[in-house]
């Protein structure tokens, strides 16, 4: 549905040249929810704006629905853009128009008959859960409701693709979850292809089928969400994954934590489990094999792309030789183990 090939984007600021994207290629199959994650300034907003040519690439090809957009005339591009909806971090609603009027606007600009506008807008407001807000004004809506209006407006022309530019960044966590569930529901019901960009791995984890990691204008990793979470190939992907599971060391342990082992001290370990290592009874196996005892301090588990992954803080009791052997064995069985210190 979306195919970007060898996209390069260069901005000129006076005598200064800024390369925002460098030879980026990305394929989003029809009906998928595809996430692009990166830090601020990585180039993700430029990338998504190249899809509908809000930013025209310096080099490369943009195919949407089998159509090459970069070669279209202005009128042809306008027609093609009707098949590409877009929502933003800021909702960009017209304050002087009601909810109904905001959603109706693209249909009015397309000279759609009034009866058809009424039918379509009513249908869309029901779809996004705002069937009772026809006559409300944006000033009287919450942030989540405003984004729902923006989603309905983006769907007004019945597009095949929806682009989401940091669509949940301005929302609180509970509202973010509800908007993501709405996008997932729309994808399921309408078969809509969704390309979203974000700096939050939680967003990717909740709804995406595939994910690409962007850094300094280049895609450094891309795969299914389950594969990236199970076997991240780059340090940046690992960092984003760690941000979704975070365990703080309890204060009483922090007060006792030492950088080097002392008499009768034991190592405090941070363990990350992904893929098959989540379900395997690895800790009990280390107890049997190496005569160590694991005291679990805290743990957390979650799902991404249908795959479980988890994190755990433990004390490992045993001799130095036993604990070292147990740690090496865990690492051989795809558990990432970090010694945080000694308590």
UniProtKB/Swiss-Prot annotation:
Subunit structure comment from the entry: The complex is composed of two ATP-binding proteins (MetN), two transmembrane proteins (MetI) and a solute-binding protein (MetQ).
Domain named ABC transporter: residues: 2-241
Keywords: Amino-acid transport, ATP-binding, Cell inner membrane, Cell membrane, Membrane, Nucleotide-binding, Translocase, Transport
Organism: Salmonella typhi
UniProt xrefs under CDD domains: ABC_MetN_methionine_transporter
EC number: 7.4.2.11
Catalytic function, reaction form: L-methionine(out) + ATP + H2O = L-methionine(in) + ADP + phosphate + H(+); D-methionine(out) + ATP + H2O = D-methionine(in) + ADP + phosphate + H(+)
Enzyme class: translocase
Principal location: membrane
GO cellular component, one term: Gram-negative-bacterium-type cell wall
Its membrane topology: Peripheral membrane protein
Name of the featured protein: Methionine import ATP-binding protein MetN 1
Subcellular localization, as worded in the UniProt entry: Cell inner membrane
A GO molecular-function annotation: ATP hydrolysis activity
InterPro entries per the UniProt record, alphabetical: AAA+_ATPase, ABC_MetN_proteobac, ABC_transporter-like_ATP-bd, ABC_transporter-like_CS, ACT-like_dom_sf, MetN_ABC, MetN_ABC_transporter-like, NIL_domain
Disulfide bonds: none
């Amino acid at each position: 549905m979306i195919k970007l090939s060898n996209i390069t984007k260069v901005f000129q600021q006076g005598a200064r040249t800024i390369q925002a994207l460098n030879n980026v290629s990305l394929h989003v199959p029809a009906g998928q929810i595809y996430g692009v994650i990166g830090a601020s300034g990585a180039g993700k907003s430029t990338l998504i704006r190249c899809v509908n040519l809000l930013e025209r690439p310096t080099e490369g090809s943009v195919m949407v629905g089998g159509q090459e957009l970069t070669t279209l005339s202005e009128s042809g591009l306008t027609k093609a853009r009707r098949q590409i909806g877009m929502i933003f971090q800021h909702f960009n609603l017209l304050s002087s128009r009601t909810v109904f009027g905001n959603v109706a606007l693209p249909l009015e600009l397309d000279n759609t008959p009034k009866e058809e506008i009424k039918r379509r807008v009513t249908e869309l407001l029901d779809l996004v859960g705002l069937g009772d807000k026809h006559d409300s004004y944006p000033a009287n809506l919450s942030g989540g409701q405003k984004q729902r209006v923006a989603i309905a407006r983006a769907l007004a022309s019945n597009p095949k693709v929806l682009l989401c530019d940091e669509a949940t960044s301005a929302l609180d966590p509970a509202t973010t979850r509800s908007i993501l569930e709405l996008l997932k529901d729309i994808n399921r019901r309408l078969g809509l292809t969704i390309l979203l960009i974000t700096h939050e791995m939680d967003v990717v984890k909740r709804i995406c089928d595939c994910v690409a990691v962007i850094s300094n204008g280049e895609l450094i990793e891309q795969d299914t969400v389950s594969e990236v979470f199970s076997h991240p190939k780059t340090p940046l992907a690992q960092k984003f994954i760690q941000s979704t599971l975070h365990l703080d060391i309890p204060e009483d342990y922090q007060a006792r934590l030492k950088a080097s082992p002392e008499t009768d001290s034991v190592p405090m370990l941070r363990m990350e489990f992904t893929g098959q290592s989540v379900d395997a009874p690895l800790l009990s196996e280390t107890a049997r094999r190496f005569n160590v005892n694991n005291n679990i301090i805290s743990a957390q588990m979650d799902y991404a792309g249908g795959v479980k992954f988890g994190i755990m803080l433990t004390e490992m009791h045993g001799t130095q030789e036993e604990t070292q052997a147990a740690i090496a064995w865990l690492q051989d069985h795809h558990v990432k183990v970090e010694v945080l210190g000694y308590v």
